[in-house]
Design a protein with these regions (language model features):
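Glycine-centered loop-to-beta-strand initiation motif
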Residues: 84-89, 189-199, 203
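Sec/Tat signal peptide C-region and signal peptidase I cleavage site
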Residues: 13-19
Length: 239
């Protein structure tokens, strides 16, 4: 019985760790020539888990890059400082329009979860956020690599997101919406790769979608069977 209890505890910890994700927090509205704050977190927001940057969990996914994509399509890498439970950076908008913030991390060691019937895989994290510096917001920018989440302006309190995989919209893609206190909702994309929903509470929402790319390869001398893609988007609490 004691052995079974230990196995259950280990599996619970494994499941919690595996469900972690990176996400970006920033104000959705910016101002010309005024510094914009950007934070990078790792954990599980709905469970109240925010990993410490000096902990092993965050260290294992800390080789990420964050890019600012300007309204004119040019981009620049964001410099980040390590804080206690997040990475912090700033950029200053100099153009009117919508800015896309993109995090990408495919520099993560291969993981062997064959014991748990998941296989041997390499993780590819991407996170997105949008900052409007205009009275007329436009859609955010997508990437041609992995999973992308694009926010489409609606002009009302409804949110529309479109999910892309390697630049193409994907239908029937499962998307999870999380808030604190273990509340979550699952939606599936339509034929155009879109989901729509409202934000009924003034709180932070994190959105996550994942996909397996069943192509084997090698990373840092370790073979893997597939790539596990994970993309996130965050709507911060309104001030």
């Amino acid at each position: 019985m004691k052995k079974l209890s230990l196995i259950f505890l280990f599996l619970l910890c494994y499941s919690t760790s595996f469900a972690h994700y990176l996400w970006i927090e920033t104000s959705p509205n910016g101002e010309l020539n005024k510094k914009q704050e950007v934070k990078i977190h790792y954990g599980e927001y709905t469970y109240g888990i925010i990993e410490q940057t000096d902990g092993d969990a965050f260290k294992s996914v800390s080789k990420f890059e964050v890019w600012i994509i300007n309204p004119d399509g040019t981009s620049s890498k964001l410099d980040l400082d390590k804080k206690e439970d997040h990475y912090l950076g700033y950029f200053t908008p100099t153009q009117e329009g919508s800015y896309t913030i993109q995090l990408k991390n495919d520099n993560i060691d291969v993981v062997d979860f064959t014991e748990y019937d998941f296989g041997i895989f390499k993780t590819y994290y991407q996170s997105f956020a949008k900052v409007n510096v205009s009275d007329i917001p436009t859609a955010s920018t997508i990437t041609e690599e992995g999973l992308s989440i694009k926010e489409i302006p609606t002009g009302n309190d409804e949110k529309i997101l479109q999910i892309f995989y390697k630049g193409a919209a994907i239908s029937e893609q499962e998307v999870k919406i999380y808030v604190s206190d273990l509340w979550s909702k699952t939606l599936n994309t339509d034929a155009e790769g879109k989901i729509s929903f409202k934000l009924p509470w003034n709180t932070k929402y994190t959105i996550e979608t994942t996909k397996n790319e069943n192509v084997p390869g090698t990373y840092n001398g370790e073979d893997y069977e597939f790539i596990w893609h994970c993309a996130t988007y965050c709507f911060p609490q309104s001030n």
